[in-house]
């Protein structure tokens, strides 16, 4: 019988080869999935370690160069340092100088050239450089690209800088700001003068304190300007903030990095390169669950597809935001609204209870000195709106609603003084100028164009004079993260009329002694604790102000009932109710408003909470420094 062999057919060979090929391809893909992230991580770690070493380690002959510069007559400039070495030498000079502020980097400075301060040309400076037992200085870097903008965020910045400097005489504050704020060598003094004038931070006028404030001008501020990026704005601003942060820390490495403006995508870079603790004072979330909720998929097929793409983009961005926030060691928020959103967004590497509210400093003491007698006799029917001229402040809505209110009020009360609206704000750039111009044009079409006025770039004393005689203070921003200006209204004795959202609703214009915020003239007292009542026994419980909605203009609206069960009205309707309060009810509401904010939002209250965070950062800085020394890094 013949032997028969089952030889594989060509089809069988193809099946085997295809199976082997697919298996090999799968193995290669699996290997790539493992190796690419691993190699990327190793490369990133090595790159950050090299940068950290170079930016902190001055050249071997740096002390001789400094001594030579100190001994020279006249202004001496140290040349010959490269980009990396200049940053390390600058850091050592700032830490050892009698006048660290002299080493500020402005728009006209060359980063590779360092001029020796005249105050440092003495024996004391050289002794400090050689004295290993001298108290160690620490640099707290405040990242705030718009340090001279004059808004609520800048008030927080300068109050934090003041409290940080007063915490320890061996602390130096470095302000990382846009170089546009520092066009000349004398610009730092101009910026500090503006902080004293605008925010009444009088401690910053002290010459000795100013010596411990160093300004580091950063390039590329236009990269974080939203108008630079009409498309993919959030993503491109995030990338721009990383570039700005790199430019700042490569000029001067701090020991603690504090972000007071809200650029969290810089945190991973700062942490990798500097190995220092990162703290953040969050004014508002870059992206929030409210933003994600505004995307509607119930549209035409084309628009629905675009909405899906936008939603995917935002969700990926939100995950990246969560990742970036995980590098922050200490998180502070400015309001309940912001705190709730940040606890929701920064869930990774953070316990919710570790994200704490630190209410911003609002200068309540200076404004609460206005006498109570002036609140009843010297107040005119003037409505004030203090806000930067930005689109989200919605000045146009206020103007439109005021016109409706003005027409109704003057027809109903022809013998009463006519109301007046005053816009107060800073003009930062050409865009702000254009918005003011358009508002002036819009005001010409009112029932009475003379019933509206504009006060631009006013110093603190001028603003205080306006608040001294005004009756109502308006805030129209939707989901305002906090609303410092609302606190200022209430401290000065004005009745606040605020949008029914965000910080003004949740934290500021809230029940006093358990009474709901009213939206009518009825003042019904409710029981309150004996301790609170004894502290404010002259002020009866009740509402502290009014809330309003903007139907058709608000992205989302809280349509819940007001205190008296009626729907919350528009701004025009709410202004009418506020102006129709009796004299006694008006006086009581002003008194309640002032007392409710006097302690909660004072500079002293902010300072005490900031000191608590300083103690945490102080310990974290010592731990991180210990890690660097263990690795053999220069420090």
From Swiss-Prot:
Record membrane topology: Single-pass membrane protein
Annotated TM spans: 22-42
Catalytic activity line of the entry: an alpha-D-Man-(1->3)-[alpha-D-Man-(1->6)]-beta-D-Man-(1->4)-beta-D-GlcNAc-(1->4)-alpha-D-GlcNAc-diphospho-di-trans,poly-cis-dolichol + 2 GDP-alpha-D-mannose = an alpha-D-Man-(1->2)-alpha-D-Man-(1->2)-alpha-D-Man-(1->3)-[alpha-D-Man-(1->6)]-beta-D-Man-(1->4)-beta-D-GlcNAc-(1->4)-alpha-D-GlcNAc-diphospho-di-trans,poly-cis-dolichol + 2 GDP + 2 H(+)
GO biological process, one term: dolichol-linked oligosaccharide biosynthetic process
Intramembrane segment spans (from-to): 232-252, 482-502
E.C. no: 2.4.1.131
Biological or metabolic pathway of the protein: Protein modification; protein glycosylation
One function term, GO molecular function aspect: GDP-Man:Man3GlcNAc2-PP-Dol alpha-1,2-mannosyltransferase activity
Name of the top EC class for this enzyme: transferase
Lumenal side of membrane: 1-21
Record's function text: GDP-Man:Man(3)GlcNAc(2)-PP-Dol alpha-1,2-mannosyltransferase that operates in the biosynthetic pathway of dolichol-linked oligosaccharides, the glycan precursors employed in protein asparagine (N)-glycosylation. The assembly of dolichol-linked oligosaccharides begins on the cytosolic side of the endoplasmic reticulum membrane and finishes in its lumen. The sequential addition of sugars to dolichol pyrophosphate produces dolichol-linked oligosaccharides containing fourteen sugars, including two GlcNAcs, nine mannoses and three glucoses.
Family: Belongs to the glycosyltransferase group 1 family.
Protein name (database record): GDP-Man:Man(3)GlcNAc(2)-PP-Dol alpha-1,2-mannosyltransferase
Lineage, uppermost ranks: Eukaryota, Fungi, Dikarya, Ascomycota, Saccharomycotina
């Amino acid at each position: 019988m013949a032997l028969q062999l089952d030889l594989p057919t060509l089809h069988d060979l193809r099946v085997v080869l295809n199976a082997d090929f697919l298996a090999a391809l799968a193995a290669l893909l699996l290997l790539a999935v493992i190796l690419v992230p691993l190699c990327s991580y190793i490369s990133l770690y090595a790159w950050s370690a090299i940068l950290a070493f170079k930016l902190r380690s001055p050249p071997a002959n740096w002390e001789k160069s400094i001594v030579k510069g100190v001994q020279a007559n006249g202004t001496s400039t140290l040349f010959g340092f490269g980009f990396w070495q200049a940053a390390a030498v600058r850091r050592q000079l700032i830490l050892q100088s009698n006048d660290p502020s002299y080493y500020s980097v402005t728009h006209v400075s060359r980063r590779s050239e360092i001029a020796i301060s005249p105050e440092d040309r003495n024996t004391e400076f050289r002794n400090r450089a050689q004295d290993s037992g001298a108290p160690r200085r620490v640099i707290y870097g405040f990242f705030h690209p718009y340090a001279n903008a004059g808004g609520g965020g800048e008030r927080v910045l300068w109050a934090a800088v003041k409290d940080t400097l007063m915490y320890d005489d061996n602390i130096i504050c470095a302000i990382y700001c846009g170089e546009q704020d520092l066009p000349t060598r004398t610009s730092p003094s101009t910026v500090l003068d503006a902080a004293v004038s605008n925010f009444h931070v009088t401690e910053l006028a002290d010459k000795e304190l100013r010596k411990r404030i160093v300004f580091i001008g950063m390039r590329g501020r236009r990269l974080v300007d939203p108008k630079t990026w009409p498309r993919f704005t959030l993503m491109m601003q995030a990338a721009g903030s990383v570039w700005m942060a790199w430019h700042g820390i490569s000029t001067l490495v701090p020991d603690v990095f504090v972000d007071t403006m809200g650029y969290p995508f810089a945190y991973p870079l700062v942490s990798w390169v500097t190995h220092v603790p990162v703290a953040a004072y969050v004014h508002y979330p870059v992206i929030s669950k409210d933003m994600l909720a505004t995307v509607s998929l119930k549209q035409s097929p084309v628009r629905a597809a675009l909405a899906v793409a936008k939603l995917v983009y935002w969700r990926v961005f939100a995950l990246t935001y969560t990742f970036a926030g995980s590098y922050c060691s200490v998180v502070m928020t400015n309001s309940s609204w912001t705190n709730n959103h940040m606890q929701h967004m920064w869930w990774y590497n953070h316990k919710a209870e570790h994200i704490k509210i630190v209410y911003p400093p609002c200068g309540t003491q200076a404004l609460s000195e206005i006498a109570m007698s002036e609140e009843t006799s010297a107040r005119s029917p003037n409505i004030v709106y203090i806000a930067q001229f930005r689109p989200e402040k919605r000045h146009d809505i206020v103007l439109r609603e005021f016109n409706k209110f003005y027409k109704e009020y003057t027809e109903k009360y022809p013998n009463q003084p006519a109301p007046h609206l005053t816009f107060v704000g800073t003009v930062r750039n050409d865009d702000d100028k254009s918005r003011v111009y358009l508002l002036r044009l819009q005001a010409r079409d009112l029932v009475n164009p003379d019933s509206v006025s504009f006060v631009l770039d006013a110093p603190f004393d001028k603003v205080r004079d306006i608040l001294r005689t005004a009756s109502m203070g308006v805030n129209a921003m939707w989901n305002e993260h906090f609303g410092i200006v609302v606190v200022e209204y209430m401290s000065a004795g004005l009745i606040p009329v605020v949008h029914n959202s965000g910080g003004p609703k949740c934290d500021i214009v809230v029940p006093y002694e358990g009474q709901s915020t009213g939206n009518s003239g009825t003042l019904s007292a409710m029981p309150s604790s004996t301790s609170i009542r004894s502290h404010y026994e002259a002020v009866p419980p009740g509402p502290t102000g009014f809330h309003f909605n903007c139907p058709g203009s608000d992205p989302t609206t809280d349509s819940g009932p007001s205190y008296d069960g009626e729907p919350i009205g528009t701004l025009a309707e709410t202004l009418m109710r506020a102006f129709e309060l009796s004299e006694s009810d008006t006086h009581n509401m002003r008194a309640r408003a002032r007392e409710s904010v006097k302690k909660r939002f004072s500079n002293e209250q902010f300072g005490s909470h900031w000191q608590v965070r300083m103690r945490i950062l102080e310990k974290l800085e010592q731990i991180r420094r210990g890690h660097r020394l263990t690795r053999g890094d220069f420090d």
